[in-house]
A protein has these predicted regions:
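Short amphipathic alpha-helical segments at helix-loop
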Residues: 2-7, 110, 114, 137-140
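C-terminal helix-rich "cap/oligomerization" subdomain common to oxidoreductases
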Residues: 56, 128-172
Length: 172
């Protein structure tokens, strides 16, 4: 069927990766948030969700995840991004399903890294996992299950917050 029913709504299935990356960049746990979402064409789950808030260390975040940036327009813009904002800089990640861009803007340095969008890099994860099993040594480049569980939990919390803040349905 259409949508992300097995993995949950789009913001859980796809958006939880942005929730995870934002938490990793901030190096801290989420403290406050406010989410807003839009449903399209009366689909029951949102196609676009924006959530902003703070981490316990005062760092601010903005996560926008959606598949509706001019969905039917000739030239689409980006589809998803995160901003993690601190007093000494910003970490920004965005992609348009063709190119992934990471910008790190600090007090003394700015880095912009652009690479072809590579999906979820499952083959890299499998290789790292296989090496860990073969050697019996955990590869620190692998994500922790705990981090995935936390990202999933917060993605659901942000989605629930958006539901409480009204999710209009647009499109015909």
């Amino acid at each position: 069927g259409e949508g992300h029913e097995y993995e949950g709504p789009s913001f859980h299935d796809c958006g939880m990766h942005y929730v995870d990356i934002s938490r990793w960049y901030a190096g801290c746990e989420y403290k406050t948030w406010h989410a807003q979402a839009i449903r399209m064409w009366d689909y029951p789950e949102p196609w676009w969700l924006q959530c902003h808030g703070t981490f316990e260390n005062g760092v601010v975040f903005d996560i926008t995840q959606g598949h509706v940036y001019g969905q039917l327009s000739k030239d689409q813009t980006h589809n998803s991004y995160i901003d993690v904002i601190g007093t000494k800089g910003i970490a920004r990640m965005s992609h348009d399903f063709k190119t992934a861009v990471v910008e790190l803007r600090g007090v003394n340095e700015t880095h912009r890294i652009e690479k072809p969008y590579g999906g979820k890099n499952i083959s890299t994860l499998c290789d790292l996992f296989a090496d860990s099993v073969r050697t019996g040594v955990f590869n620190s480049r692998l994500p922790l299950m705990r981090d995935s569980a936390i990202a999933s939990e917060y993605a659901w919390k942000f989605l629930d917050n958006a539901r409480r803040n009204e999710m209009p349905s647009i499109g015909n």
